Amino acid sequence: MARVYDAFMERFPSWSALTEATPTDLRPLLEPLGLWQVRAGILSRVAHAMVAGGGAVPASRLELEHIKGIGQYTSAAILLVVHGHDEPLLDANMARVLERYFGLRTHFDIRDDPYLHALACHVVRRPNSLEVNWAILDFAALICKAKRPLCEQCPVHAKCKFFKKAHTGH
């Protein structure tokens, strides 16, 4: 996302400018991120909702999730980045880190798991919650990988349930 942000903001400096964009206008900026057609539609709906709301980004999860295309993860990201709320960016990567360290989740779908949400909130609710979120996501990508995690390089493996089970069988 960082690699297209500046070009995107230069091309579409306001919600109004974005409402006038066609999928063809958005394609070169969104294609490198994948799923550009889906994202183009979502961006268009969000831009129209923002213009209709006077340009203010909603500050509540309920208001944000009323916009078609904005779900739990995106609303949490907006609340965290735009409004400074201490929200966890709970995706499959963060869920993997939390599950491995603390223990298995209680529900199949991470979006509906109160245990996982409580853990995520506990971990990221700090004065520097944005940095904590990014650190966990980076950690998931670099150390606590989905396949072949680098447990020996993990700074917290001594207390990690996944590590203990993998290395002791308990």
Name these PLM-found stretches.
Residues 1-169:
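Catalytic cores of DNA base-excision repair glycosylases
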